[in-house]
């Protein structure tokens, strides 16, 4: 049977393949279809989403090149589109890697040496996925396209590439660069582009790239972003993710058909001591009742209502003041000789401005940065991102901050709104590889006791226990937005410990 190999994948005549497989044809298509799992509380009128690892173009049906072995039984005769790749300049440049990073580099390099090589790297947040990928770029010496989800991550990639591989010509591809039509791998060695821009490009744009790196690859499951896979099939592809199969609806499984099963590396021995300060907050009756849409509780609308409580906003401000005081007045007590930073997470963008205004009134001379200038001007400014690397307080949404944002001086988190998903990535913002291990990590978690969302705290407990962080409980209310003394409710060193204490763990613990 004849087939073609192109940037869209393996193309086979639809009718001939259907005739050849007969009843197995339907089974094949079903096996390559991912159907979203219905989530608790999901309205029945919302259609269940499906995504397929095949696409139809005219008389042909295209499959990911990764699946070509499944067609070997048909003695396929492939017509391959020729691709000519130039080699990048070979300059001996060394930069340090941890042992686990070097082992993974060797493994990835071996896999990507083969034509149409694929590798899906699963490495926890903060452990150096970017540095591993840059080492692969240096070894393969192919013109490379790096696809990232946000401008913040794009800037981090540019900075890291420029630092580690200064001999290469590196450029950022964004909406402004789109006007420069000749900006391709002929002019640059490595191009770092944002998915929202690149997914609109024709397949000819991707032709000169011998290697494509997909940062946060698990996020490419969305209907629009997923289309990128049908334009890069001829390239070697390296996917990077800290949470490759973590979506509640299971839609990120579609990525496996293109990249293969995620491959984990041996976890490093670096540990960060820390603890959780869980505040049971009793909100004002006017703000704690659930908001229902189509007879189902809406988490987003309920959170929006919770944050209309001025006392709850003040509680967050008070906790920020408490942490800042600990960090600056008595830094030696917390395992450091200098102040360090606080990240305040909220659920959605409009809350960033609310908390920024509230914090600004209390912190007159403290640098507070909100990198997501997108809430005002449609994009993140380079200035805001640069300021964030020295700021004492950073405000982020969960959706923006859970991605590969790196601020190594940040060691405390305040979760200003409830959260259930992506907690591994959220905590990863204060446990970056290469940051100071001596500094105690502190997580402030507010549990709204009268809200239907209060049960989400138990999902967070699971992650805290996995990290080995003891949990200290205290209380506050709309009448008294200052938290009470702490009570130890879980101790990683004594599972049954329910002793009362007001003393946080020491750095040595």
Swiss-Prot record:
List UniProt keywords, sorted A-Z. ATP-binding, Helicase, Hydrolase, Late protein, Nucleotide-binding
Task: Write down the Gene3D superfamilies for this protein, in alphabetical order.
Answer: P-loop containing nucleotide triphosphate hydrolases
Q: Does the keyword ATP-binding apply?
A: yes
InterPro entries with a match to the protein in the record: Helicase/UvrB_N, Helicase_ATP-bd, Helicase_Restrict-Modif_Enz, P-loop_NTPase
Residues covered by the Helicase ATP-binding domain? 110-262
Instruction: Kindly list the positions annotated as binding ATP.
Output: 123-130
Which residues belong to the signal peptide in this entry? none
Catalytic function, reaction form: ATP + H2O = ADP + phosphate + H(+)
EC number, UniProt record:
3.6.4.13
Give the location of motif DEAH box in residue numbers: 215-218
Q: Report whether ATP-binding shows up as a keyword of the record.
A: yes
Give the main EC class. hydrolase
What induces this protein's gene, according to its Swiss-Prot or TrEMBL record? Expressed in the late phase of the viral replicative cycle.
Q: Which domain of life is it from?
A: Viruses
Annotated GO molecular function terms are: ATP binding; ATP hydrolysis activity; DNA binding; RNA helicase activity
Question: Into which family does the record put it?
Answer: Belongs to the DEAD box helicase family. DEAH subfamily.
Name the UniProt record assigns to this protein: Putative ATP-dependent RNA helicase QP509L
Biological classification of the source: Viruses, Varidnaviria, Bamfordvirae, Nucleocytoviricota, Pokkesviricetes
């Amino acid at each position: 049977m004849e087939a073609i190999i192109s940037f869209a994948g393996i193309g086979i005549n639809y009718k001939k393949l259907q005739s050849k497989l007969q009843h197995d044809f339907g089974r094949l298509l079903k096996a390559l279809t991912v159907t979203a799992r219905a989530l608790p509380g999901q309205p029945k009128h919302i259609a269940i989403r499906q995504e397929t690892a095949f696409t139809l173009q005219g008389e042909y049906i295209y499959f990911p090149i990764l699946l070509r072995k499944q067609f070997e039984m048909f003695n396929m005769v492939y017509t391959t589109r020729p691709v000519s790749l130039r080699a990048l300049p070979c300059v001996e440049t060394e930069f340090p890697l941890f042992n686990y990073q070097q082992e993974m580099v060797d493994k990835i390099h071996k896999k990507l040496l083969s034509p149409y090589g694929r590798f899906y790297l699963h490495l926890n947040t903060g452990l150096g996925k970017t540095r591993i990928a840059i080492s692969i770029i240096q070894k393969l010496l192919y013109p490379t396209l790096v696809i990232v989800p946000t401008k913040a991550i794009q800037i981090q990639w540019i900075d890291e590439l420029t630092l580690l591989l200064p001999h290469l010509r590196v450029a950022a591809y964004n909406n402004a660069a789109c006007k420069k039509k000749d900006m391709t791998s002929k002019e640059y060695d490595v191009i770092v582009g944002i998915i929202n821009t690149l997914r609109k490009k024709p397949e000819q744009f991707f032709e000169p790239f011998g290697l494509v790196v997909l940062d946060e690859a698990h996020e490419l499951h969305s209907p629009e972003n997923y289309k990128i896979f049908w334009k890069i099939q001829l390239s070697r592809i390296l996917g990077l993710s800290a949470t490759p199969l973590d979506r509640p609806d299971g839609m990120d499984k579609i990525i496996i058909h293109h990249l293969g099963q995620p491959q984990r590396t041996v976890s490093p021995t670096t540990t960060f001591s820390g603890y959780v300060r869980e505040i049971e907050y009793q909100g004002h009756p006017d703000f704690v009742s659930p908001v229902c849409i189509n007879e189902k509780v809406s988490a987003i609308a309920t959170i929006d209502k919770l944050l209309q409580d001025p006392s709850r906003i003040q509680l967050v401000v008070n906790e920020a003041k408490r942490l800042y005081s600990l960090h600056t007045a008595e830094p030696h007590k917390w395992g450091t000789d200098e102040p360090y930073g606080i990240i305040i997470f909220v659920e959605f963008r409009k809350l960033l401005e609310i908390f920024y205004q509230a914090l600004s009134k209390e912190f007159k001379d403290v640098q507070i940065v909100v990198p997501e200038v997108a809430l005002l001007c449609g994009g993140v400014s380079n200035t805001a991102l640069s300021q964030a690397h020295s700021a004492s307080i950073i405000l982020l949404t969960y959706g923006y901050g859970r991605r590969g944002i790196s601020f190594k001086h940040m060691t405390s988190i305040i979760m200003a709104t409830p959260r259930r998903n992506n907690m591994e990535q959220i905590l990863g913002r204060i446990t970056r590889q290469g940051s100071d291990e001596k500094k105690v990590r502190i997580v402030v978690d507010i549990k709204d006791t009268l809200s239907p969302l209060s049960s989400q705290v138990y999902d967070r407990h699971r992650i805290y226990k996995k990290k080995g962080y003891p949990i200290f409980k205290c209380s506050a209310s709309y009448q008294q937005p200052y938290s009470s003394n702490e009570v130890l409710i879980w101790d990683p060193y004594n599972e049954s410990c329910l002793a009362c204490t007001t003393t946080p763990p020491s750095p040595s613990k």
